[in-house]
């Protein structure tokens, strides 16, 4: 599941990690909460390609982040879960947020997704071993955060 985060006209994407049966932990989510507390307008969104969208939503409703909220509650209406490819998800998120593709960053562990999404003008970061702190820091630096 890919998570997209917006800061003004910037859209970030990261991969969450599950540490235990239902606790989701991510330094990036913690960092986002910190940036929000500093007054930055940051919104989060999810894009997931699956043939089981109902199951993915069920999981999001039951996974809990470190502050006790569900994963679903972190993203509001910015959830794109379907069998469509990532470019469809990005187009839908663009429609919902108005954020230009050129102001987006996308992390993914599949070359195909990186190749396709980059054609939209999105900055893509390949994460073969999953989202790591260095990837998050690279994206923040890229956008001056």
Residue spans for each PLM region:
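Asp-based, Mg2+/Mn2+-dependent phosphohydrolase catalytic module
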Residues: 87-105, 110-145
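Alpha-helical substrate-recognition element adjacent to the catalytic core
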Residues: 1-84
């Amino acid at each position: 599941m890919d998570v997209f985060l917006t800061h003004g006209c910037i859209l970030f994407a990261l991969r969450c990690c599950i540490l235990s049966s239902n606790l989701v932990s991510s330094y990036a989510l913690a960092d986002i909460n910190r940036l929000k507390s500093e007054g930055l307008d940051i919104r989060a969104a999810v894009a997931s390609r699956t043939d089981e969208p109902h199951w993915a939503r069920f999981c999001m409703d039951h996974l809990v982040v470190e502050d006790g909220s569900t994963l679903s509650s972190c993203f509001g209406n910015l959830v794109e879960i379907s069998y469509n490819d990532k470019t469809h998800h990005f187009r839908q998120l663009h429609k919902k947020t108005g954020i230009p593709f050129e102001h987006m960053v996308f992390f993914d562990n599949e070359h195909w997704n990186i190749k396709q999404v980059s054609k939209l003008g999105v900055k893509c970061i390949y994460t073969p071993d999953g989202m790591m702190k260095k990837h998050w820091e690279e994206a923040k630096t890229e956008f001056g955060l």
